[in-house]
UniProtKB/Swiss-Prot annotation:
Subunit field text: Homotetramer, a dimer of dimers. One homotetramer interacts with 1 SecA dimer.
Gene3D superfamilies given in the database record: SecB-like
PANTHER family: PROTEIN-EXPORT PROTEIN SECB, PTHR36918
Source taxonomy: Bacteria, Pseudomonadati, Pseudomonadota, Alphaproteobacteria, Hyphomicrobiales
Protein role: One of the proteins required for the normal export of preproteins out of the cell cytoplasm. It is a molecular chaperone that binds to a subset of precursor proteins, maintaining them in a translocation-competent state. It also specifically binds to its receptor SecA.
UniProt entry keywords in alphabetical sequence: Chaperone, Cytoplasm, Protein transport, Translocation, Transport
Membership in a protein family: Belongs to the SecB family.
HAMAP family: SecB
Protein name: Protein-export protein SecB
GO function terms (MF aspect): unfolded protein binding
NCBIfam families: PRK05751.1-3, secB
Amino acid sequence: MANGNGTGAEVDAAPAINAMVQYTKDFSFENPNAPRSLGPQDKPPNIQIQVNVNAKQVAENDFEVNILLEGSAKTDADTLFKFELDYAGLFRLINIPQSDAHPVIMIECPRLLFPFARQIIADAVRSGGFPPLYIDPIDFAALYRQRMSQVAANEQAPTVA
């Protein structure tokens, strides 16, 4: 009989994600037109950011999850800066059914990593002489749905022999 305080077997069976370690796998920041690009600009730069999430299983319940962020800030004439960040974490899934593992890995794990990746980019852009770039929060659930729709569409597309 449970004692109502959330201890015992029911806690042991609770689903959980353990972030075992987080790390920068690869990072690049380029400031190709400094110091000329560091002066006042006539208008705000065009900022483009691409996001991708990858994961691979490294042990029975352990997964390495990567957020890949690539971006640039450009004016009509110049590139102000460019960056590429591959930020990863090693996650252990506990008591998560196999049927739920893929969305947990591709949505929840990146959601846990994102604030740290965002801060790395903000600090690098600031250190490059620009105001910090705070990337807007990313809807990893929408990104996951979009990716799954693309996979489904590719599987249904006829192949050319």
